[in-house]
Amino acid sequence: MGNRTKEDELYREMCRVVGKVVLEMRDLGQEPKHIVIAGVLRTALANKRIQRSELEKQAMETVINALVK
C-alpha cells in the first residue's frame, strides 16, 4: 500500500464507512443526521453474523465515538 500510515488507512476506512451509511440512508429517504448515522453504525457493528476486518471495526468505533461527542 505504499507509504500510507495506519492513521491514513483508518481515516480512509472511516470515510468509506460513513459514505456508505449516508448513501444507504438517502436511498431509504432518511435524513442523515449524525446521531442516526452513529445508531446505524452501532447496529451494524453489533451484528456478529457479518465478518469485518479489524480496520473496519476500528473505523466504525472511531466514527461512532466522534459523532456522539
UniProtKB/Swiss-Prot annotation:
Keywords: Lyase. It holds the Pfam family DUF2767. One of its GO terms (molecular function) is fumarate hydratase activity. Belongs to the FumD family. The gene is fumD. In vitro catalyzes the addition of water to fumarate, forming malate. Cannot catalyze the reverse reaction. Cannot use the cis-isomer maleate as substrate. It comes from Escherichia coli (strain K12). The keyword Zinc does not apply. It comes from the Bacteria. It is an enzyme of class 4 (lyase). Disruption phenotype: Cells grow to slightly higher density than wild-type in sublethal levels of streptomycin. This is Fumarase D.
